[in-house]
Amino acid sequence: LVVVHIATRTKVAELDLGGQPDSVAVSKDGRYAAVVIENERDESVNGGAIPQLPAGRLAIIDLVGAPAAWTRRDVALTGLAALYGTDPEPEYVSINEDNIAVVTLQENNHLALVDLATGKVSGHFSAGSVTLTDVDLTDERPNLVQFNQTQADRLREPDGVTWVSKTRFATANEGDLNGGSRGFTVFNTDGSVAFDVGMDLEYRLARIGHTNDRRNDAKGNEPENVAFGRF
């Protein structure tokens, strides 16, 4: 982890993370940084199948004192997911006002909640699946978009995530291994689904001519990240 002084554009500190980081979030009160250590799988090994150790984890950085004095705590995420539980591949992290981090485990199709103060997993659950109807799953030549097929039990496999309140967060369901649901979902912290956009993103892209038929037999629009704001 490299710490940079923005005003002077100089590096002021480094902290060894002991693995391959993917994303980072800083708590609103400035007490913690949460760094996802994905230890990403090698897609050229065994066809990209997992498990491929070492397992991923979450690193909590305690932002106490000068950056050179910051310390790291590691939170194990193994044994949580029903899919490939020995090899969690955390992807993205977001922190709410109570300093609870939500972490996506994309290839595991799982979500974990971590209390940054205690460094403990306070909850976790599967991201679940959806059945997509009136979807185009065919790569035609010449390009032709036809929303007339069904894709049953498609794993969401979320990538980006953001809190939308203290008790709800939204995920961008890109898919990376066997899933991807072409949209986004709003979850409650108990794992229940408050809202799922279904095929609406795909239809809106088609209406404005931004549908690439070559992607229809794969993961469609592949939403990778999500942000939240009030206007």
Predicted regions and their residues:
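Surface-exposed loop and turn segments in beta-propeller and other repeat-based domains
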Residues: 64-88, 123-152, 192-219
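Short, conserved, GDST-rich strand-edge loop motifs in beta-rich repeat architectures
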Residues: 36-56, 171-182
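Residue-level detector of Asp-centered blade-edge/turn motifs that repeat once per structural unit
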Residues: 26-30, 96-98, 164-166, 230-231
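Beta-propeller blade signature
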Residues: 1-9, 51-65, 119, 181-191
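C-terminal substrate/ligand-recognition segments
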Residues: 215-231
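Beta-rich catalytic cores
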Residues: 20-22, 54, 89, 107, ...
